[in-house]
Amino acid sequence: MSDEVLARAKMEQADRSAAPTEALLPTFEEFAALSTFERVAFRLTHRMNLGTWKRFWTWCQSFFGAGWIHISTYNLMRIYGLENVEAVDHSRPLLLVANHRSFFDMYVVSTTLFRKTKWQKQLFFPVRGRFYYQNPVGMFVNLIMGWWSMYPPFFVTGKDPVPAKRPFDKYSMRRLVQLSREGAGNVVGFHPEGTRNKNDDPYAFLRPQPGIGKLIKDANPQVIPVFITGLSNNLPKQVLGNWFGGDKIRIHFGRQLDLSEFIAKKDHVRTYKEIGEFLMSKITELAEQDREEFGERRQA
Protein backbone atom coordinates (compact mmCIF):
# COMPACT_ATOMS: atom_id res chain seq x y z
CA MET A 1 0.00 0.00 0.00
CA SER A 2 2.82 2.38 0.79
CA ASP A 3 4.24 1.77 -2.69
CA GLU A 4 0.92 2.86 -4.21
CA VAL A 5 0.90 6.02 -2.11
CA LEU A 6 4.48 6.76 -3.11
CA ALA A 7 3.69 6.18 -6.78
CA ARG A 8 0.65 8.47 -6.56
CA ALA A 9 2.72 11.18 -4.88
CA LYS A 10 5.32 10.95 -7.64
CA MET A 11 2.60 11.25 -10.29
CA GLU A 12 1.11 14.30 -8.58
CA GLN A 13 4.55 15.88 -8.37
CA ALA A 14 5.11 15.20 -12.07
CA ASP A 15 1.74 16.76 -12.91
CA ARG A 16 2.62 19.89 -10.96
CA SER A 17 5.99 20.20 -12.65
CA ALA A 18 4.39 19.72 -16.07
CA ALA A 19 1.76 22.38 -15.47
CA PRO A 20 2.47 25.78 -17.00
CA THR A 21 3.88 28.33 -14.61
CA GLU A 22 1.94 31.46 -13.71
CA ALA A 23 2.33 34.47 -15.97
CA LEU A 24 5.32 36.57 -14.97
CA LEU A 25 4.72 40.04 -13.54
CA PRO A 26 7.12 42.99 -13.45
CA THR A 27 9.00 43.81 -10.27
CA PHE A 28 8.23 47.02 -8.39
CA GLU A 29 11.29 48.71 -9.91
CA GLU A 30 10.38 47.61 -13.43
CA PHE A 31 6.77 48.73 -13.07
CA ALA A 32 7.88 52.07 -11.62
CA ALA A 33 9.56 52.92 -14.94
CA LEU A 34 6.11 53.36 -16.52
CA SER A 35 3.84 56.38 -16.34
CA THR A 36 0.46 56.12 -14.65
CA PHE A 37 -1.37 55.68 -17.96
CA GLU A 38 1.13 53.09 -19.17
CA ARG A 39 0.64 51.10 -15.97
CA VAL A 40 -3.13 51.09 -16.43
CA ALA A 41 -2.76 50.11 -20.09
CA PHE A 42 -0.37 47.31 -19.24
CA ARG A 43 -2.47 45.95 -16.37
CA LEU A 44 -5.56 45.79 -18.58
CA THR A 45 -3.81 44.28 -21.60
CA HIS A 46 -1.92 41.79 -19.45
CA ARG A 47 -5.19 40.62 -17.91
CA MET A 48 -6.80 40.29 -21.34
CA ASN A 49 -4.00 37.91 -22.34
CA LEU A 50 -4.64 35.43 -19.53
CA GLY A 51 -6.99 32.49 -19.06
CA THR A 52 -10.66 32.88 -19.90
CA TRP A 53 -10.21 36.41 -21.20
CA LYS A 54 -7.51 35.28 -23.65
CA ARG A 55 -9.72 32.46 -24.90
CA PHE A 56 -12.61 34.88 -25.40
CA TRP A 57 -10.54 37.42 -27.32
CA THR A 58 -8.94 34.65 -29.38
CA TRP A 59 -12.43 33.57 -30.43
CA CYS A 60 -13.25 37.17 -31.37
CA GLN A 61 -9.99 37.40 -33.29
CA SER A 62 -10.65 34.18 -35.17
CA PHE A 63 -14.29 35.03 -36.00
CA PHE A 64 -14.60 38.80 -36.34
CA GLY A 65 -10.98 39.82 -36.93
CA ALA A 66 -10.06 37.09 -39.39
CA GLY A 67 -13.52 37.42 -40.93
CA TRP A 68 -13.26 41.05 -41.98
CA ILE A 69 -9.66 40.67 -43.11
CA HIS A 70 -10.70 37.70 -45.26
CA ILE A 71 -13.56 39.70 -46.79
CA SER A 72 -11.10 42.52 -47.53
CA THR A 73 -8.37 40.35 -49.08
CA TYR A 74 -9.82 37.07 -50.41
CA ASN A 75 -9.29 38.01 -54.07
CA LEU A 76 -5.67 38.94 -53.44
CA MET A 77 -4.38 36.40 -50.92
CA ARG A 78 -2.00 33.67 -52.06
CA ILE A 79 -0.56 31.23 -49.47
CA TYR A 80 2.48 29.00 -49.92
CA GLY A 81 4.08 26.47 -47.57
CA LEU A 82 1.28 26.25 -45.03
CA GLU A 83 2.07 22.54 -44.68
CA ASN A 84 5.24 23.62 -42.84
CA VAL A 85 3.10 25.22 -40.12
CA GLU A 86 0.91 22.14 -39.91
CA ALA A 87 3.99 19.93 -39.45
CA VAL A 88 5.24 21.50 -36.19
CA ASP A 89 4.47 20.20 -32.71
CA HIS A 90 1.37 22.13 -31.66
CA SER A 91 1.87 21.20 -28.02
CA ARG A 92 4.83 23.61 -28.03
CA PRO A 93 5.02 27.35 -28.80
CA LEU A 94 5.70 28.45 -32.36
CA LEU A 95 7.69 31.58 -33.25
CA LEU A 96 6.96 33.08 -36.68
CA VAL A 97 9.72 35.42 -37.87
CA ALA A 98 8.70 37.63 -40.79
CA ASN A 99 9.92 40.57 -42.83
CA HIS A 100 8.16 43.84 -42.05
CA ARG A 101 6.94 46.24 -44.75
CA SER A 102 3.34 46.99 -43.78
CA PHE A 103 1.35 47.74 -40.66
CA PHE A 104 -0.86 44.81 -41.66
CA ASP A 105 1.75 42.04 -42.08
CA MET A 106 0.82 40.02 -39.03
CA TYR A 107 -2.92 40.59 -39.51
CA VAL A 108 -2.91 38.63 -42.77
CA VAL A 109 -0.68 35.97 -41.21
CA SER A 110 -3.05 35.55 -38.26
CA THR A 111 -6.04 35.39 -40.61
CA THR A 112 -4.32 32.64 -42.58
CA LEU A 113 -3.67 30.63 -39.42
CA PHE A 114 -7.21 31.00 -38.11
CA ARG A 115 -8.93 30.21 -41.41
CA LYS A 116 -6.59 27.59 -42.85
CA THR A 117 -5.59 25.55 -39.78
CA LYS A 118 -7.76 23.81 -37.19
CA TRP A 119 -5.50 23.33 -34.15
CA GLN A 120 -6.13 25.42 -31.05
CA LYS A 121 -3.96 28.51 -30.91
CA GLN A 122 -3.54 31.88 -29.20
CA LEU A 123 -1.52 34.68 -30.75
CA PHE A 124 0.87 37.22 -29.25
CA PHE A 125 2.54 40.08 -31.11
CA PRO A 126 5.16 42.09 -29.17
CA VAL A 127 4.88 45.77 -30.09
CA ARG A 128 6.33 49.18 -29.43
CA GLY A 129 4.63 50.42 -26.32
CA ARG A 130 4.98 54.08 -27.31
CA PHE A 131 1.71 54.03 -29.25
CA TYR A 132 -0.38 51.11 -28.04
CA TYR A 133 0.28 51.69 -24.34
CA GLN A 134 0.60 55.46 -24.07
CA ASN A 135 -2.78 56.82 -25.16
CA PRO A 136 -6.44 55.75 -25.44
CA VAL A 137 -6.28 55.66 -29.25
CA GLY A 138 -3.49 53.10 -29.14
CA MET A 139 -5.43 50.94 -26.70
CA PHE A 140 -8.53 51.20 -28.90
CA VAL A 141 -6.54 50.08 -31.94
CA ASN A 142 -5.15 47.15 -29.95
CA LEU A 143 -8.72 46.17 -29.11
CA ILE A 144 -10.44 46.50 -32.48
CA MET A 145 -7.49 45.42 -34.66
CA GLY A 146 -5.57 43.03 -32.45
CA TRP A 147 -8.15 41.87 -29.92
CA TRP A 148 -5.53 42.72 -27.26
CA SER A 149 -2.92 40.43 -28.86
CA MET A 150 -0.37 43.24 -29.31
CA TYR A 151 1.48 42.24 -26.18
CA PRO A 152 3.93 42.47 -24.43
CA PRO A 153 5.08 46.07 -25.03
CA PHE A 154 8.64 47.30 -25.55
CA PHE A 155 9.58 50.96 -25.15
CA VAL A 156 13.33 51.08 -25.88
CA THR A 157 13.17 50.02 -29.53
CA GLY A 158 13.13 51.59 -32.97
CA LYS A 159 12.91 55.34 -33.54
CA ASP A 160 12.85 57.65 -30.50
CA PRO A 161 13.53 55.03 -27.80
CA VAL A 162 12.83 55.89 -24.17
CA PRO A 163 15.91 54.75 -22.18
CA ALA A 164 14.23 55.45 -18.84
CA LYS A 165 11.85 52.58 -19.53
CA ARG A 166 14.60 50.04 -20.11
CA PRO A 167 13.86 48.30 -16.77
CA PHE A 168 10.34 47.50 -17.96
CA ASP A 169 11.64 46.20 -21.29
CA LYS A 170 13.69 43.65 -19.35
CA TYR A 171 10.44 42.36 -17.89
CA SER A 172 8.78 42.30 -21.32
CA MET A 173 11.61 40.16 -22.66
CA ARG A 174 11.24 37.70 -19.77
CA ARG A 175 7.51 37.51 -20.40
CA LEU A 176 8.06 37.01 -24.13
CA VAL A 177 10.54 34.24 -23.40
CA GLN A 178 7.94 32.59 -21.17
CA LEU A 179 5.30 32.76 -23.91
CA SER A 180 7.77 31.34 -26.43
CA ARG A 181 8.99 28.55 -24.17
CA GLU A 182 5.79 27.12 -22.68
CA GLY A 183 2.13 26.98 -23.58
CA ALA A 184 0.46 24.63 -26.06
CA GLY A 185 -0.76 26.57 -29.09
CA ASN A 186 1.15 29.76 -28.32
CA VAL A 187 2.04 31.52 -31.57
CA VAL A 188 4.36 34.53 -31.33
CA GLY A 189 4.78 36.81 -34.34
CA PHE A 190 8.08 38.69 -34.48
CA HIS A 191 9.82 40.99 -36.97
CA PRO A 192 13.62 40.52 -36.72
CA GLU A 193 14.20 43.84 -38.52
CA GLY A 194 12.65 45.63 -35.56
CA THR A 195 10.88 48.28 -37.64
CA ARG A 196 9.11 48.67 -40.97
CA ASN A 197 11.33 48.57 -44.03
CA LYS A 198 10.34 51.55 -46.22
CA ASN A 199 12.58 50.59 -49.15
CA ASP A 200 10.69 50.41 -52.46
CA ASP A 201 12.29 47.05 -53.21
CA PRO A 202 10.13 44.31 -51.63
CA TYR A 203 13.12 41.95 -51.71
CA ALA A 204 15.43 44.23 -49.71
CA PHE A 205 15.70 43.91 -45.93
CA LEU A 206 17.02 45.78 -42.92
CA ARG A 207 19.65 44.31 -40.64
CA PRO A 208 18.14 42.18 -37.87
CA GLN A 209 18.16 43.38 -34.27
CA PRO A 210 19.81 41.21 -31.58
CA GLY A 211 16.60 40.94 -29.55
CA ILE A 212 15.28 38.09 -31.69
CA GLY A 213 18.49 36.18 -31.09
CA LYS A 214 18.22 36.57 -27.33
CA LEU A 215 14.59 35.44 -27.42
CA ILE A 216 15.46 32.27 -29.32
CA LYS A 217 18.56 31.58 -27.22
CA ASP A 218 16.58 31.85 -23.97
CA ALA A 219 13.32 30.19 -25.05
CA ASN A 220 14.40 27.67 -27.72
CA PRO A 221 10.98 27.68 -29.46
CA GLN A 222 10.01 26.14 -32.76
CA VAL A 223 10.79 28.72 -35.46
CA ILE A 224 9.37 29.17 -38.96
CA PRO A 225 10.49 31.95 -41.33
CA VAL A 226 7.82 33.91 -43.20
CA PHE A 227 8.05 36.19 -46.24
CA ILE A 228 5.19 38.59 -46.97
CA THR A 229 4.78 40.86 -49.99
CA GLY A 230 2.05 42.87 -51.71
CA LEU A 231 0.53 44.70 -48.74
CA SER A 232 -0.03 48.45 -48.65
CA ASN A 233 0.09 50.75 -45.63
CA ASN A 234 -3.02 52.56 -46.88
CA LEU A 235 -6.02 50.77 -45.38
CA PRO A 236 -8.77 52.14 -47.70
CA LYS A 237 -6.58 51.48 -50.76
CA GLN A 238 -5.79 47.99 -49.52
CA VAL A 239 -9.46 47.11 -48.96
CA LEU A 240 -10.62 48.58 -52.29
CA GLY A 241 -7.82 46.76 -54.06
CA ASN A 242 -9.53 43.47 -53.25
CA TRP A 243 -12.17 44.33 -55.87
CA PHE A 244 -10.34 46.79 -58.11
CA GLY A 245 -7.09 45.12 -59.08
CA GLY A 246 -4.82 45.55 -56.08
CA ASP A 247 -1.45 43.82 -55.77
CA LYS A 248 -1.59 40.15 -54.90
CA ILE A 249 -0.68 39.42 -51.26
CA ARG A 250 1.71 36.49 -51.11
CA ILE A 251 2.67 34.77 -47.86
CA HIS A 252 5.42 32.14 -47.89
CA PHE A 253 5.89 29.90 -44.84
CA GLY A 254 9.28 28.19 -44.75
CA ARG A 255 10.28 24.95 -43.11
CA GLN A 256 10.94 24.76 -39.38
CA LEU A 257 14.50 25.88 -38.68
CA ASP A 258 17.16 23.85 -36.91
CA LEU A 259 18.77 26.29 -34.47
CA SER A 260 20.55 23.74 -32.28
CA GLU A 261 23.94 25.03 -33.44
CA PHE A 262 23.18 28.45 -31.98
CA ILE A 263 21.43 27.18 -28.84
CA ALA A 264 24.66 25.36 -27.93
CA LYS A 265 26.76 28.53 -28.26
CA LYS A 266 27.75 30.95 -25.53
CA ASP A 267 25.04 33.31 -24.29
CA HIS A 268 26.48 36.46 -25.84
CA VAL A 269 25.38 39.40 -28.01
CA ARG A 270 27.48 37.99 -30.84
CA THR A 271 25.42 34.81 -30.73
CA TYR A 272 22.20 36.84 -30.76
CA LYS A 273 23.38 38.67 -33.88
CA GLU A 274 24.36 35.41 -35.57
CA ILE A 275 20.89 34.02 -34.93
CA GLY A 276 19.31 37.17 -36.37
CA GLU A 277 21.47 36.99 -39.49
CA PHE A 278 20.60 33.32 -39.95
CA LEU A 279 16.88 34.07 -39.68
CA MET A 280 17.09 36.85 -42.25
CA SER A 281 19.01 34.56 -44.60
CA LYS A 282 16.11 32.11 -44.46
CA ILE A 283 13.57 34.88 -45.05
CA THR A 284 15.72 36.00 -47.98
CA GLU A 285 15.60 32.48 -49.44
CA LEU A 286 11.80 32.65 -49.40
CA ALA A 287 11.96 36.11 -50.98
CA GLU A 288 14.21 34.80 -53.76
CA GLN A 289 11.76 32.00 -54.46
CA ASP A 290 9.02 34.62 -54.77
CA ARG A 291 11.18 36.83 -57.00
CA GLU A 292 11.97 33.93 -59.33
CA GLU A 293 8.30 33.11 -59.80
CA PHE A 294 6.62 36.49 -59.55
CA GLY A 295 9.30 39.18 -59.77
CA GLU A 296 8.60 40.05 -63.39
CA ARG A 297 4.82 39.89 -63.02
CA ARG A 298 4.04 41.49 -59.68
CA GLN A 299 0.27 41.42 -60.32
CA ALA A 300 0.13 37.65 -60.98
Residue ranges and their predicted role:
Residues 83, 100-102, 129-131, 194, ...:
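Short, flexible loop/turn elements at secondary-structure junctions
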Residues 2-34, 45, 165-300:
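Non-catalytic C-terminal accessory region of glycerolipid acyltransferases
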Residues 48, 89-165:
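Catalytic core of membrane glycerolipid acyltransferases/transacylases, capturing the structured
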Residues 64, 79-83, 112-113, 173-175, ...:
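A generic local structural motif
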Residues 79, 125, 151-154, 223-225, ...:
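Conserved beta-strand scaffold positions in the cores of enzyme catalytic domains, especially
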